[in-house]
């Protein structure tokens, strides 16, 4: 009975904190807050209400190596998609992410050729993590993705994918 009460209190606290604060902790590198939420029973792949991204999306976008590693160890889905169809590897191509994050995601099976949702008016289709890294001038990450078989959206479309 006591453990049920503790679980209910933890759930109420988490709901009262709003999911965005949990995700923001992942983005900001607040590893203790992320651990507390996970220890209290937060679903590792819970999505926020605004961008529909998981903790892992936010940690990757924020360049938080330790939190990415923690979340992967906790069973986070490295191929989860957010509201734009981006995976955490798509976000690893931004200007705050590190090569370590891309390496961790790829080592755990991130799809290097995942395509996000096509923006309106684009004829070539969605963008891959390689496209995102290239646009972000993240040559080291782009080379890593390419080394693991990553292609651009245009290359995939030319192949009929």
Give, region by region, the residue ranges found by the protein language model.
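Start-of-repeat signature of ankyrin repeats
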Residues: 51-52, 85, 119, 126
């Amino acid at each position: 009975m006591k453990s049920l009460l503790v679980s209910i209190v933890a759930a109420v606290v988490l709901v009262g904190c709003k999911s965005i604060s949990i995700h923001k902790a992942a983005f900001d590198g607040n590893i203790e807050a992320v651990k507390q939420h996970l220890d209290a029973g937060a679903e590792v792949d819970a999505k926020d209400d605004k961008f529909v991204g998981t903790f892992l999306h936010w940690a990757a976008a924020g360049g938080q190596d330790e939190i990415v590693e923690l979340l992967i160890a906790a069973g986070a889905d490295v191929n989860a998609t957010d509201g734009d169809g981006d995976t955490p590897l798509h976000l690893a191509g931004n200007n705050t992410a590190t090569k370590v994050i891309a390496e961790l995601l790829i080592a755990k099976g991130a799809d290097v050729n995942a395509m996000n949702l096509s923006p309106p008016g684009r004829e070539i289709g969605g963008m891959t993590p390689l496209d995102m890294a290239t646009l972000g001038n993240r040559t080291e990450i782009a080379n890593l993705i390419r080394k693991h078989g990553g292609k651009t959206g245009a290359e995939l479309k030319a192949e009929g994918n």
